Design a protein with these regions (language model features):
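N-terminal flexible/basic segments that precede or flank functional cores
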Residues: 1-8, 69-87
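DNA major-groove recognition helix of helix-turn-helix/homeodomain DNA-binding modules
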Residues: 53-71
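Short basic helix-loop element that most often maps to the first helix and adjoining turn
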Residues: 16-30
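Short, conserved glycine- and acidic-residue-centered signature motifs
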Residues: 10-14, 24, 52
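Alpha-helical residues within the helix-turn-helix
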Residues: 22, 33, 47
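Recognition helix of helix-turn-helix/homeodomain-like DNA-binding domains
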Residues: 36-51
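Conserved hydrophobic/aromatic packing and binding residues within compact polymer-binding modules
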Residues: 17, 31-32, 42-45
C-alpha cells in the first residue's frame, strides 16, 4: 500500500537536519527543546537512524519555521530561505 501523500512530503534525512542546524547556527539542545523530541532520538536521526513520522514532522516544522527549505532535487539538501522571498 503506498504511503499517504502528506507523509511523503515529510520525508527528510538526518544529514539534512544536521545541515539545517548548521545553517541556523542552532545547537542540538535548542532543537530538542523546540520539538520536545528526546536527545537520543535527535542524535539517532542525525546519525542516519529512522524516526517515527510524527517526530520527523515535528523536526521539519521547527526548522522550516526558522527559515529552512528542504530540497530533494537529485540529492537531499537544505537551504536558508531568503528573507525577501515569498514562499
Amino acid at each position: 500500500m503506498p504511503e499517504p501523500k502528506s507523509t511523503k512530503k515529510l520525508h527528510i534525512v538526518g544529514e539534512q537536519v544536521a545541515a539545517a542546524r548548521g545553517l541556523l547556527k542552532m545547537q542540538q539542545a535548542e532543537l530538542i527543546e523546540a520539538t520536545g523530541v528526546s536527545k537520543a532520538t535527535i542524535i539517532r536521526f542525525e546519525a542516519g537512524g529512522s524516526v517515527r513520522p510524527e517526530t520527523m514532522e515535528a523536526v521539519r516544522n521547527v526548522l522550516e519555521e526558522r527559515g529552512i527549505v528542504f530540497t530533494n532535487g537529485g540529492e537531499p539538501g537544505v537551504k536558508l530561505r531568503r528573507k525577501d522571498a515569498d514562499y
